[in-house]
Amino acid sequence: MAKQDNSSSHENTLTEMQRYVTQEHGTEPPYSGKLLHNKDEGIYHCLICRAPLFLSDSKYDSGCGWPSFYQPFSPEAIRYLEDDSHGMQRVEIRCGSCDAHLGHVFPDGPQPTGERFCVNSASLSFTDDNGNKTLG
């Protein structure tokens, strides 16, 4: 999949942090995200294209400082890339629809998957079961 440039269509609506995270592969400071402590039932979407990424049922408190999920909404929801930046070997996760940076996945999550999808709040929007929307 070719990387799409999402910045131009959202240039005037993204905050500096949202742009930094989704377009420049940045990371928000730990414990700073608006959706970290969200416990409402609903769906987490890509902030850029609104594709569904995670269900609230798969969210858990990993203690890492970012929203954590043990599985994506669907296998196609997430794109995986090797990330050797900062002297570490990690797996970057991006939106499977628009290629926006989301965070990283680690093999230290709970069952049933054993995976921890560590996601920047700034890359997400959340819609609760009543249709109310919150931006990360």
UniProtKB/Swiss-Prot annotation:
<dbReference type="GO" id="GO:0033743">
    <property type="term" value="F:peptide-methionine (R)-S-oxide reductase activity"/>
</dbReference>
<feature type="binding site">
    <location>
        <position position="46"/>
    </location>
    <ligand>
        <name>Zn(2+)</name>
    </ligand>
</feature>
<dbReference type="GO" id="GO:0006979">
    <property type="term" value="P:response to oxidative stress"/>
</dbReference>
<feature type="binding site">
    <location>
        <position position="98"/>
    </location>
    <ligand>
        <name>Zn(2+)</name>
    </ligand>
</feature>
<keyword id="KW-0560">Oxidoreductase</keyword>
<dbReference type="InterPro" id="IPR011057">
    <property type="entry name" value="Mss4-like_sf"/>
</dbReference>
<dbReference type="GO" id="GO:0005737">
    <property type="term" value="C:cytoplasm"/>
</dbReference>
<feature type="active site" description="Nucleophile">
    <location>
        <position position="118"/>
    </location>
</feature>
<dbReference type="GO" id="GO:0008270">
    <property type="term" value="F:zinc ion binding"/>
</dbReference>
<dbReference type="InterPro" id="IPR002579">
    <property type="entry name" value="Met_Sox_Rdtase_MsrB_dom"/>
</dbReference>
<feature type="binding site">
    <location>
        <position position="95"/>
    </location>
    <ligand>
        <name>Zn(2+)</name>
    </ligand>
</feature>
<keyword id="KW-0862">Zinc</keyword>
<keyword id="KW-0479">Metal-binding</keyword>
<protein>
    <recommendedName>
        <fullName>Peptide methionine sulfoxide reductase MsrB</fullName>
        <ecNumber>1.8.4.12</ecNumber>
    </recommendedName>
</protein>
<dbReference type="GO" id="GO:0030091">
    <property type="term" value="P:protein repair"/>
</dbReference>
<dbReference type="InterPro" id="IPR028427">
    <property type="entry name" value="Met_Sox_Rdtase_MsrB"/>
</dbReference>
<dbReference type="Pfam" id="PF01641">
    <property type="entry name" value="SelR"/>
</dbReference>
<feature type="domain" description="MsrB">
    <location>
        <begin position="7"/>
        <end position="129"/>
    </location>
</feature>
<feature type="binding site">
    <location>
        <position position="49"/>
    </location>
    <ligand>
        <name>Zn(2+)</name>
    </ligand>
</feature>
<comment type="similarity">
    <text>Belongs to the MsrB Met sulfoxide reductase family.</text>
</comment>
